[in-house]
Amino acid sequence: MNQTAPEQLTIWTFDWVPEGPRGYVRDLRLRWACEEAGLSYRVGSVPFEDRGAEHRAMQPFGQVPYLTDGDVSLFESGACLLHLSEKSETLMPRERALRAETLSWVLAALNSVEMVSVPWWFVGLSSPPENPLEGWLRARLTVLEDVLTARDWLVDDRFTAADLIMADVLRPPWIRAIGDYPATEAYINRICARPAFAKAHADQIAHFSRADETREA
């Protein structure tokens, strides 16, 4: 495990992953948040193929990302995102009602949408004649389509952490291919066109590409 000075804000990810998940590993959410908020950070890495005790001391499930911020450490991308959001009004409004709405939508992305979309995807990998979760996912996407038909952003007519996490949950092409949701598609495209997303995405791809070179050397 790479070590870092304790005062640095550090996003921890794997040292390498196969091609498939690149661009979707969830440290991207934290890189993106830092880029949006203008927060200085570094990226540390832990072994993908040897998830030892030191890693599990920081992330009990042996996953990524986790975040260290001085003497504070957090795991789970949602918890880390909320911690970063408290550092910037760009991500988290300070007015109480808007803050509450942002928190609600962040958790909706993780609990009401991603909790359905990820199991739906895993079931689909086995190519069943009919995915039993598809109706559930379509119902959630229909709710979002109605919301996003009425407004451009989830909270306060501007980008917040709620949009960051919702767009990241929705952007995988296998989710976007499930049906015709034009307002949602426009929303994802608009958010993923932001320079902060482009940089975070490119940086993650570059991180794993450099690891390929090391493995091949």
Language model features with spans:
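Residue-level detector of family-conserved "landmark" positions at structurally sensitive sites
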Residues: 44, 77, 183, 201-202
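Terminal-tail/helix-coil boundary detector
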Residues: 202-217
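GST-like domain detector, emphasizing the conserved glutathione-binding G-site
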Residues: 1-132, 145
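Residue-level signature of transmembrane alpha-helix interfaces in integral membrane proteins
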Residues: 54, 179, 184, 210-212
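Generic domain-boundary/flexible-linker signal
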Residues: 20-22, 175, 202
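GST-like fold's C-terminal all-alpha helical module
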Residues: 4-7, 106-195, 200
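Short, solvent-exposed turn/loop segments enriched in Gly/Ser/Thr/Pro and often Arg
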Residues: 47, 161, 204-205
